Amino acid sequence: KTGVTAALSLLSGFLITNLLIKNAVARPRPFDTYTQIIPLIIRPKDYSFPSGHTCASFAVALVCLRMLPGKWGILPVVLAGMIAFSRLYLGVHYPGDVLAGFLVALLTSTVACRLMRRTFSPQKS
């Protein structure tokens, strides 16, 4: 159940972030705007806003936080936070991009968890 919920959150986050918002906003990446920034990875070719990596990692991590016990729910959130920070450190996102990616993930994980809870909850007669 957790895996299906995480996959639903991840897929919906990808669709919202990469297919809708990125193309609608079309925000250049920091290294495109500020030439003194040298990215530490191969230059991504898509737009900056919102961060797809942050959205993807938190889309799964927040589902884990809600559905898994104890450290098994917290560890993915810590790892997602590290991924979010890395996007800033690598010079490929602005802080607002990372925040927006997190907010999309918060939305998709919440909707996915509620949908799965309704789908798999015992029916009252």
Task: Identify the role of each PLM range.
Residues 1-15:
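Interfacial segments of alpha-helical transmembrane regions
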Residues 38-125:
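Membrane-embedded catalytic cores of phosphoryl/pyrophosphoryl-handling enzymes
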